[in-house]
Amino acid sequence: MSFVCGISGELTEDPVVSQVSGHIFDRRLIVKFIAENGTDPISHGELSEDQLVSLKSGGTGSAPRNVSGTSIPSLLKMLQDEWDTVMLNSFSLRQQLQIARQELSHSLYQHDAACRVISRLSKELTAAREALSTLKPHTSAKVDDDVSIDESEDQQGLSEAILAKLEEKSKSLTAERKQRGKNLPEGLAKTEELAELKQTASHTGIHSTGTPGITALDIKGNLSLTGGIDKTVVLYDYEKEQVMQTFKGHNKKINAVVLHPDNITAISASADSHIRVWSATDSSSKAIIDVHQAPVTDISLNASGDYILSASDDSYWAFSDIRSGKSLCKVSVEPGSQIAVHSIEFHPDGLIFGTGAADAVVKIWDLKNQTVAAAFPGHTAAVRSIAFSENGYYLATGSEDGEVKLWDLRKLKNLKTFANEEKQPINSLSFDMTGTFLGIGGQKVQVLHVKSWSEVVSLSDHSGPVTGVRFGENARSLVTCSLDKSLRVFSF
């Protein structure tokens, strides 16, 4: 029977077995290995010559002859010894190579893990710095049982000059509104005409096609201002089908946009908790209003064109100067509670405004005193959108469960309720400039005749939730946007 040596891989002349590892070796090679290392070459346990057991096979044989150092057999013996040395060295090198490979693999894994940790820590550090930059020291002063005003160092309060400016603008707007209310515009769309509304244009390349869709809309004339999940704000001429300007700077989705009457200034509110004021002439950010500590959900421009209201998930509303970028006051809708404010809108006269919140309550606020003037608790789900009629008498509110309510601000009561069968959130509400029609954006687009509170037309052209609805001049067209990435124009 022949045995193979565990060191050389050749047939053994004098096979022995190691009591430590159980492997078979040629006695000549293993004795030399023990003399040099004192261990078993396979298990690396301590090994002596006494622990080697000879293996014998059946049959007879003669012992090898002794050779002298001057004969050819002697030379062959020397060559054999050299071969043995090479085999031992080769075996040792193979073991060292295997160990080196294992150590290298371990080091590479450690390096990869270290790189991942460094990358994660860098991201966390960047996020922490951004969060720190948004924090502002503030103290809260209790004003009354209904409201808490945040008196931060950056908030100047409503000065006498600001209040005088707002009151003067309110008086002029009230006089103009009374004059307009005597006669409706000759070109105002009729109910039967609006019933024939059809899609005349669909624009799908305004925002990123890879990140649907459009979340906010405002229009002035033939210009639309839209905000999207792609974090950008776009000024678009939908008649010429031309992008006029793209504004980039927010790092989260856009929740609300306002196009200033000057058609040059654009304002956007984002889930990154910032409000940005943009210049359409060079796409630059003229001011960043950093007053909230949570996503800004809605904004509304004062009729003076200089101030803006903002609502946030941090349970506060704020009044800010868009020229300086400074917050003038910041008020909690419910002191001691974290109630997200989903919607906010100025009354046409600019001295009162409404908020809709997650507690399903609509509140009317007096801006001068920052106090609640009235509360409407009729909804059963969070109020997602609100809109004042241009005549100043009515307020429309839409909730998460698909209900639209019309409130009389003179009698402080609910006049009408319109319930959608789909029970889907009402994302947008908008009156036309005369207050005759109300546009609703939910799972589809709907137009109601306010006086009769009846549906004039229902449009299901969008394939996703409708996030913005605006009437064109004299209600002769309707512009809408949706999470399906499209801006659509309807006319008759």
Curated annotation (Swiss-Prot):
Its EC number is 2.3.2.27. WD repeats lie at residues 207-246, 249-288, 291-330, 336-375, 378-417, 461-491. Gene3D superfamilies: YVTN repeat-like/Quinoprotein amine dehydrogenase, Zinc/RING finger domain, C3HC4 (zinc finger). GO terms for cellular component: cytoplasm; nucleoplasm; nucleus; Prp19 complex; U2-type catalytic step 1 spliceosome. Disruption phenotype: Enhances sterility conferred by rnp-4 disruption. Combined with emb-4 knockdown, leads to accumulation and leakage of unspliced ama-1 and tra-2 to the cytoplasm, severe growth retardation and arrest in larval stages, and loss of interaction of rnp-4 with pre-mRNA and spliceosomal U snRNAs. Pfam families: Prp19, U-box, WD40_Prp19. Keywords: Developmental protein, Differentiation, DNA damage, DNA repair, mRNA processing, mRNA splicing, Nucleus, Repeat, Spliceosome, Transferase, Ubl conjugation pathway, WD repeat. SMART domains: Ubox, WD40. SUPFAM superfamilies: RING/U-box (SSF57850), WD40 repeat-like (SSF50978). Homotetramer. Component of the NTC complex (or PRP19-associated complex) which is associated with the spliceosome. This is Pre-mRNA-processing factor 19.
